Amino acid sequence: MNFIDEVKIYIKGGNGGNGCVSFHREKFIDRGGPDGGDGGRGGSVIFRSNHHLNTLVNYRYKQHFTAENGENGKGSNRSGKSGKSLVLDVPIGTQIFSEDGNILLHDFTEDDQSFEIIKGGSGGLGNSHFKTSVNQAPRKRTEGEIAEEMWIHLSLKLLSDVGLVGLPNAGKSTFLSVVTAAKPKIADYPFTTLVPHLGVVYVDDEEFVIADIPGLIEGAHQGHGLGDKFLKHIERCNVLIHLIDGSSNDVVVDYNTVRLELGSYSDHLEHKIEIICLNKCDVLTDEEIQEKINKLQQATNKEVFSISTYTNLGVNKIVKLALKIIKNQE
């Protein structure tokens, strides 16, 4: 399935039905009074979050959505049938913006939330409403209300507790596959991960969601590599796990490259709690591991953990630390 996280669509509510001009007809009654019914209300446009969805692909090819119009009123004071509302399902984490993207209209953060974005138009009044003492046979009625229409922007931000960051080939996808049941594509070349992946980590009868996004390279915020368009998917997380390839010639440069891209994208993202992990320690000697950890700790003034997603060295410790941070922020 294609991963689509940005779409622009047109939506319109249903118009109200027109009121009816009608007069009572009955045998032996020449001039019955007005009995025109009201028009039915138009259908509304409603968005609803659905945990079974994880992409906006349903809105990629069909972009125009209109609720049903209300029916016109009828004689014998019969009102027109109301139009059916249009319910559009979106993944949890979807945000609805104005067409220009500047105004946030709604943010879906839980399952089965509903948001009525456009109300259907009111039905018009039939001529029975306009009978007066001086006008016993009015031919006046009103038309149904024209419903609102608009273009909107849908943006999906995946909901996760932990975000994995690092350069391409830092081992993020392997980390995700080791600690969860997720099955991301893994190979020994850059940009194996082309779309975000989510997995659920189970720890001591508790769980949290972790997101792996495509690796960042220098200049990602300027569109280089796969760019920074996937960084929004870790904006909601509580903690970042920053994986660094231990086999790299300069782990400090690698670390700073990713930090620069995070800061260029968002101050909020740059200041999230971070767990720094020197990965692929299985291919290093103890002396090499300690040397690289010392360099990173001097450069960051933070604790650095040695792990190997190949042998599972230190991985469980990182998972438990992440869970502890998440619980402390609840």
Swiss-Prot record:
| Top EC class for this record | hydrolase
User: Per the database record, which ranges form the Obg domain?
Assistant: 1-159
Q: Which GO terms describe its biological process?
A: ribosome biogenesis
Per the database entry, which stretches of residues form a coiled coil? none
Which GO molecular function entries does the Swiss-Prot or TrEMBL record give? GTP binding; GTPase activity; magnesium ion binding
Q: Which UniProt keywords apply?
A: Cytoplasm, GTP-binding, Hydrolase, Magnesium, Metal-binding, Nucleotide-binding
Residues annotated as binding Mg(2+): S173, T193
Give the EC number.
3.6.5.-
* GO annotation, cellular component aspect: cytoplasm
User: Cross-referenced Gene3D superfamilies, in alphabetical order?
Assistant: GTP1/OBG domain, P-loop containing nucleotide triphosphate hydrolases
Q: Which InterPro entries does this UniProt record tie to the protein?
A: G_OBG, GTP-bd, GTP-bd_Obg/CgtA, GTP1-OBG_CS, GTP1_OBG_dom, GTP1_OBG_dom_sf, OBG_GTPase, P-loop_NTPase
Required cofactors, per record? Mg(2+)
Superkingdom classification of source: Bacteria
Q: Where in the cell is it found?
A: Cytoplasm
Q: Predominant location of this chain?
A: cytoplasm
Which ranges carry the OBG-type G domain?
A: 160-327
Query: Subunit notes for this chain?
Result: Monomer.
What does the protein in this record do? An essential GTPase which binds GTP, GDP and possibly (p)ppGpp with moderate affinity, with high nucleotide exchange rates and a fairly low GTP hydrolysis rate. Plays a role in control of the cell cycle, stress response, ribosome biogenesis and in those bacteria that undergo differentiation, in morphogenesis control.
Can you tell me which family this protein belongs to? Belongs to the TRAFAC class OBG-HflX-like GTPase superfamily. OBG GTPase family.
Q: What is this protein called?
A: GTPase Obg
- What species is given as this protein's source? Rickettsia akari (strain Hartford)
Taxonomic classification, please? Answer: Bacteria, Pseudomonadati, Pseudomonadota, Alphaproteobacteria, Rickettsiales
- Its gene is obg
